Amino acid sequence: MDDLKSKYLAAIAEAADESALETLRVAAVGKKGEISLKMRELGKMTPEERKTAGPALNALKDEINSALAAKKAALADAALDERLRSEWLDVTLPGRQRPAGTLHPISQVSEEVAAIFADMGFAVAEGPRVESDWYNFDALNIPGHHPARAEMDTFYMKRAEGDDRPPHVLRTHTSPVQIRAMQEHGAPIRVICPGGVYRCDYDQTHTPMFHQVEGLAIDRDISMANLKWVLEEFVRSYFEVDDVELRFRASHFPFTEPSAEVDIRCSWEGGQLKVGEGDDWLEILGSGMVHPKVLEAGGIDPTQWQGFAFGMGIDRIAMLKYGIPDLRAFFDSDLRWLRNYGFSALDVPTVHAGLSR
């Protein structure tokens, strides 16, 4: 046994790698190893011989296993030391630049619009995107025979058989939020209502989903003059120009009376829009004085209060300001497009510090 002990302890000490160590383990204490075979011979010995040989063989086996484990740990430590020597890292080097996300142009323009109107005392109001047809149409003085209520223009929610609740639609404009704001806060009130809206339309300048912002101001003795001033201030701030000329054209909207579409004087140079100069006119929004029936639907007495309202497409004014040619690209989720037209999340737009960077 002393010879076996010396033989294997010396071989274990000289093992150069884990493969050689495994070969020694199998040769010594494996199923057919020398020490294992010796232990099988215990059954052939007399009781007196077993009392002496048994403990000695067990002690030898334990010592060999301990030597194998210690050598394996030493080899692992040596391998780690060698790896650390060859694969060093300079911790003083700067880290890798992680690509930062950008704000979508719709989010940026929504923030710009909110900042401009907040400076004029307007709060932001929001409402549900699934609306009853009363809020979306009836409360806004849109009659039942109006083309906008047809299924070819409006997304109606499917109803289960026996469901007798009023019809619901994906809102076609953010005007229902104005009704809800009047019902909740009464008069006087100044709010803008940004958000997503839905219509059955799809081409280069129309998508089934798009974004609008509508404004509402109600007080005593409000007139079209107040509306004109608010819109001039907005256009001047949004397009970041010192001078702007607006043209009000008579129009018809069921929810305002009188109604007007608003154009801005502009020019196009190299495909870029220049506001406040040139001989062209570009329509940007609709507006007017709030119809008395709409005030009544909002719970406001039209004999005591007057107001104006306006609405514009956020996607459209984003395209005009930032030179985006196709409305459909807003919804394509193309990372290349988003990196090109996106904005830093750290640049919060304000009227005094600047809207865009």
From Swiss-Prot:
Its main location: cytoplasm. One of its GO terms (molecular function) is phenylalanine-tRNA ligase activity. Binds 2 magnesium ions per tetramer. Its EC number is 6.1.1.20. GO terms for biological process: phenylalanyl-tRNA aminoacylation. Its cofactor is Mg(2+). It is found in: Cytoplasm. CDD domains: PheRS_alpha_core (cd00496). It catalyses: tRNA(Phe) + L-phenylalanine + ATP = L-phenylalanyl-tRNA(Phe) + AMP + diphosphate + H(+). Keywords: Aminoacyl-tRNA synthetase, ATP-binding, Cytoplasm, Ligase, Magnesium, Metal-binding, Nucleotide-binding, Protein biosynthesis. Mg(2+) binds at E257. One of its GO terms (cellular component) is cytoplasm. InterPro entries: aa-tRNA-synth_II, aa-tRNA-synth_II/BPL/LPL, Phe-tRNA-synth_IIc_asu, Phe-tRNA_ligase_II_N, Phe_tRNA_ligase_alpha1_bac, Phenylalanyl-tRNA_Synthase, tRNA-bd_arm. It is an enzyme of class 6 (ligase). Disulfide bonds: none annotated. Belongs to the class-II aminoacyl-tRNA synthetase family. Phe-tRNA synthetase alpha subunit type 1 subfamily. NCBIfam families: pheS. Tetramer of two alpha and two beta subunits. This is Phenylalanine--tRNA ligase alpha subunit. It comes from Dinoroseobacter shibae (strain DSM 16493 / NCIMB 14021 / DFL 12). The lineage of its organism: Bacteria, Pseudomonadati, Pseudomonadota, Alphaproteobacteria, Rhodobacterales. The gene is pheS.
